[in-house]
Amino acid sequence: MKIKTGGVGFHVAFKVPNNKTQIMESFLDSHENFMRETHHIEGTVEPVVLCYAVLKSPEFNNPLDPSSGETGHTLYGITEIYNGPEGAQAHMVLGQERAEMFAELVKLTNEYCVSGILGAPIIRAMH
């Protein structure tokens, strides 16, 4: 399935001190397992995830110039894209059923989230 306008996505960005990255890595392990166990990559049974990607990079003093040095933080981005609101809603329901993982997400979001785009429409895509 292709990502197209009208789909619905999530993108959450975190800025984590380098000495705390193991907490994020542990969460990402459990989140990836959750995604693999409960989501589909094809078919009609929601949630069908069109994109699940996690990005990680040191935070640079100047992001356009890596030679500027690092800030001592690591940046993470989690991106998920679904066909429409039904898939996004199914994802949220399933995620909240995993109370421990969901509580960890809330804790990490409260501490380290710097940007969150939640359940937003895809407004541009390569068709």
Which stretches of residues belong to each language-model region?
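Short S/T/G/P-rich N-terminal loop/turn motif that feeds into the first structured element of a domain
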Residues: 1-77, 83-93, 108-127
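Amphipathic protein-protein interaction modules
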Residues: 88, 96-102
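Hydrophobic small-molecule pocket/channel-lining residues, especially in calycin-type beta-barrels
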Residues: 104-106
